[in-house]
Structure formats: structure tokens, C-alpha cells
Curated annotation (Swiss-Prot):
The keyword DNA-binding does not apply. Residues 30-61 are extracellular. The gene is Cyyr1. GO terms for cellular component: membrane. The lineage of its organism: Eukaryota, Metazoa, Chordata, Craniata, Vertebrata. It comes from the Eukaryota. This is Cysteine and tyrosine-rich protein 1. It is a single-pass type I membrane protein. Residues 1-29 form the signal peptide. Residues 153-165 have a biased composition (Polar residues). It is found in: Membrane. Pfam families: CYYR1.
Amino acid sequence: MDALRLPRRLGVLLWKVVLLFVYAEDCRAQCGKDCRAYCCNGSTPHCCSYYAYIGSILSGTAIAGIVFGIVFIMGVIAGIAICICMCMKNNRGTRVGVIRAAHINAISYPMAPPPYTYDHETEYCTDLPPPYSPAPQASAQRSPPPPYPGNSRKYSSSQNRICNN
């Protein structure tokens, strides 16, 4: 019985397509006052391209808004996915924000902390270095070390004469 209905539906569809092509010849996009900028020289009855009109509408602000919306939706999806993964990982059906204090302490401190004493802080260290004593003067026969490369120190005229000799 369904096999007999199929050709009838096909015939109705075919008839509608034929009517569409017959009457579509008179349907032309006229270049009115609002559309004149997007038509070919304003003389043809058909507008050249609706893509030019859409391209004008999709300015930088609209494109930025679309990109922001897509990124925002991706962030929401990622947040939901993370929430679902965390809930599935726990296998206890823990709701977001409902965590017991004992559970938090078990995460932070897996075992008891070591005892804290002040002994090492209050002890006076007896191994201090010896008090400062000035080193003996070096002999005057040693020459001073050479200057570092790129030394930008200005020399006096007497030093320049010594260096030039």
C-alpha cells in the first residue's frame, strides 16, 4: 500500500517544481533606491550578487562578535565537560560545591604533619666565624689588574700621556 502512495507524492512534488520554474521568470530582484549600491551599474533588473550586500553587513564588529560568541560557547562546553568528568571520576555523585571538610583535609594532608619544635630556632650557634680582622697590606710592587673590556671610564690627561707612551 505504501508503494502505491510514493508515486503520487512524487507527482505532487514534480508538479510544484514545474510551477516554480514557470512563475520564477517574472520574479526579479529589482534595483531600487536601497539596493542601488549593490547592483551592476544600476541598469540591470537583477542585482549582481547578494554576497556583496552580506559582505557589507558583516563588518569587522560583526565578525568580532561572532568570534567572541563562538569562543564563549566553546568555553561553556569545556566547563560542562570538565564538570561531568570530575563527577564521573568521583563515582559518588558528588555535586559541585558539596565537599566535606574531612575530604579536603585528606587531600591536603595525606598523613599527620610532623611535630613542630622551636629548638633549632632558639639554639645559639657556637660555630660562628672569627671576628673581622683587617688583612695585611699587599706589597706596593704589584701592578694593578688590567681594566675590564669595554671600560668606559674617562682618563685624565696625565693618564692619557702615560698610556700613549
